[in-house]
Amino acid sequence: MDRRTKIVCTLGPAVASKDAIRRLVEDGMDVARLNFSHGEHADHEQNYKWVREATDETGRAVGILADLQGPKIRLGRFLDGATVWETGETVRITVDDVEGTHDRVSTTYKNLAQDAKPGDRLLVDDGKVGLICREVDGNDVVCEVTEGGPVSNNKGVSLPGMDISVPALSEKDIADLRFALKLGVDFIALSFVRSPADVDLVHEVMDEVGRRVPVIAKLEKPEAVDALESIVLAFDAIMVARGDLGVEVPLEQVPLVQKRAIQIARENAKPVIVATQMLDSMIENSRPTRAEASDVANAVLDGADAVMLSGETSIGVDPHNVVRTMSRIVQHAETDGHVPPLNHIPRTKRGVISYSARDIAERLNARALVAFTTSGDTARRVARLHSHLPLLVFTPDAAVRSQLALTWGAETFLCREVTSTDEMMKVVDESLLAMDSYQRDDMMVVVAGTPPGVSGNTNMIHVHLLGEDVRR
């Protein structure tokens, strides 16, 4: 595989057909994102089916990610649908259910008057409009407009620095989570994570449904930045969701949060996605800005497992051009750039084995690293090292293969169950010698666990020549 960093594409009206989704797969989409902030369950179900059909037809492993809306706080509705707040004006945000006027509008967050205090900031529509609380008057929060602009029905409201009392999962999120699990998605992304304990609520619902899949923590809140290391440990992967993050924390901090998050995720062998406005201008244009190209390349050079497209593919004028453009930028960054080495000394058996396998393969100038895995853990531990060698991953579990679509560099093969090391090598020979890329006697460094099939039991490195008789 020429490109090692994976691409996540958000599905939406711009690609709402089987042919369009198949073309995304052919263009290079590795993970399809179902955004539950928009669309009906029927829309997501249809897109899910089209992705699975496309993967069956093309043979590519593509994961499917269900992104939950989270407890998003919004304004209510205006009598006229919209208004313009001018800087210096006084407006009231109320917890009462009222039809909004220019001077007073409701909010979906019914504890606002209880939680707000003078001096707190309220940011509307991703920070385009700024307010500051001057006083709390009964059920109303009286605000001065510090940065004016247009506001309209149901615009989002961010409350940076305010200690808000909302659950990690709304009723809508729970319903969407149940639906997505029954549908068969490969990942769940949890929005507005504040604490490592937030994952427990998701697991409770998963256990009720009877199906667990990896949970991705979206870094959007200051609390998540403060608890970053413990959140990385608790969750299965993380997403640096720079849109809401850039509203909730000072904008100048976002690049360093991104770099720190990627570093911590790599140290813990957890996949990390960099998201939001990566090629945003391509929603309307055929070419990205130079700054956007640099942004994508820098995410690659930071060591991200994946980069994500949002509106660019869901509502953009040419989603296929966007994916191809991102793929070219990524490939060039990988070819001519340099990802800093992981300066992390492994302390576990699995970590030491993975490091050693990489070192042996590179010192012997092997053709590839090969990982056998039942859970994906072995592959992720090797992938985080970003070797220049191909990483070929064999698994008997179709779900694990789909989940590894998010892991840097993992080229996956679905194989039969094996019961011995000899069988492993036979599977490698059968699969790779059938490809034009590999020849008999090519050296492979295989990392796996014995006995095979035991999750988390990485304990073996085997230097194998393709086609050799492994029996002694």
Locations of regions flagged by a protein language model:
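Non-catalytic helical/linker scaffolds that mediate oligomerization, partner binding
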Residues: 1-472
